[in-house]
A protein has these predicted regions:
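Generic structural signal for residues positioned in beta-strands
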Residues: 32, 59, 123, 149, ...
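Conserved functional hotspot residues or short segments at active or partner-binding sites
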Residues: 219-329
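Cleft-lining beta-strand/loop regions that shape enzyme active-site pockets
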Residues: 1-199
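Polar, glycine-rich mid-to-C-terminal structural blocks
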Residues: 161, 173, 178-245
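A general structural signal for short secondary-structure boundary/capping elements
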Residues: 142-146, 198-203, 256-264, 277
Length: 329
């Protein structure tokens, strides 16, 4: 197993590990490797430029809201996104697409900093514990990194911190949210409680830890992201649009609720914002490829619980070929 191999290779930085590799011809060779910290670049923010109809648009992909909790000054999602925005501005892009698809969340502080790159200043998210006062986390920096057109892409697996960022930019009418009908719908905060620090004079050994849900996130308009997630302004179907994947589909999820909204100033009056949304929706309705994706998504849903397999080989092949033809569409 690969996991077992990785466990043997990993070790303290600077030490050596020797890999004995067997070649195809049967001979072996010993390769020494000095252990060091490995940074997987695909796990960090990156950008590219898309050119269409003589226009240039920037695409920023962020797989997670990463941070070094021991030192916020080190590389983190917010600082990396800021660098990518600067690169795209130098390239003269006319708009930016922020891709948060499959981003399961991460550091809340990086969300607050990141949202501030697109607005002057103001509240980003509200946090409230059971019976406690709500806390408003705000961007206090009036500088703006990007004031041009902005789109945020999401899907059913955009969760937690991703939902906070998408919700804030949507509430300000700063960005158009495009993607699945709604995001994952995780609007809760968990904390790990060390039981050894709670019970004094413990004679039972290590008591372990307990993970508790202690707080809930709320949009600046007062609504929670729990269960309902963030509704896309423009719904773009995907193959798994009808598969049950969200928080609402889990066992015993906490209910959606709302609190009082906080004061904030809209980025846009709404006219151009709403016009762009309506035009995009109309184009999607008339697009045959989009309709084909939706049909395939419904077909995948119909097969979700299909666990019957024929023991007749010819019947099995026939069904398999029909499935392949459907997926090739």
């Amino acid at each position: 197993r690969l996991d077992d191999v990785i466990k043997l290779i990993k070790g303290p930085k600077g030490t050596q590990v020797f890999l004995t590799i067997k070649k195809v011809d049967g001979s072996t060779v010993v390769v020494p490797i000095t252990r060091d910290v490995i940074e997987l670049e695909e796990a960090f923010a990156k950008s590219t430029i898309i050119e269409k109809n003589n226009q240039r648009f920037g695409l920023i992909h962020l797989p997670r809201f990463y941070v070094d909790f021991s030192d916020y000054g080190n590389r983190n999602a917010a600082s990396d996104v800021k660098k990518e925005i600067a690169k795209l501005k130098e390239e003269g892009v006319e708009g930016i697409v922020f891709d948060l698809r499959n981003n399961g969340g991460g550091s809340l502080q990086t969300v607050v900093d990141m949202a501030g790159y697109f607005i002057e200043d103001g509240p980003i998210v509200q946090v409230k514990s059971t019976g406690g006062q709500k806390q408003i986390l705000s961007d206090l920096d009036k500088s703006i990194e990007w004031d041009g057109p902005l789109v945020v892409m999401v899907n059913e697996f955009s969760a937690s911190a991703s939902e906070i960022l998408a919700a804030a930019l949507q509430d300000y009418k700063r960005a158009i949210v495009l993607g699945s009908k709604q995001t994952f719908g995780k609007g809760t905060v968990q904390n790990v409680i060390d039981l050894n620090q709670i019970i004094s004079n413990n004679t039972y050994g290590d008591l372990g830890a307990m993970k508790l849900t202690t707080d809930k996130f709320y949009r600046i308009n007062g609504g929670s992201t729990q269960l309902e997630g963030v509704k896309s302004d423009i719904i773009f179907p995907n193959r798994y649009a009808y598969i049950d994947t969200g928080e609402k589909d889990q066992d015993n999820p906490l209910e959606w609720d709302k609190i009082s909204p906080t004061e904030f100033n809209l980025w846009s009056s709404g006219d151009q914002y709403n016009y762009a949304i309506e035009r995009s929706r109309k184009r999607l309705e008339d697009n045959p490829f989009v309709q084909l994706i939706d049909e395939q998504a419904k077909w995948i849903k119909s097969r979700q619980n299909d666990n019957d397999y024929s023991l007749n080989f010819d019947a099995y092949l026939e069904k398999n070929e029909a499935t392949e033809q459907k997926t090739e569409k």
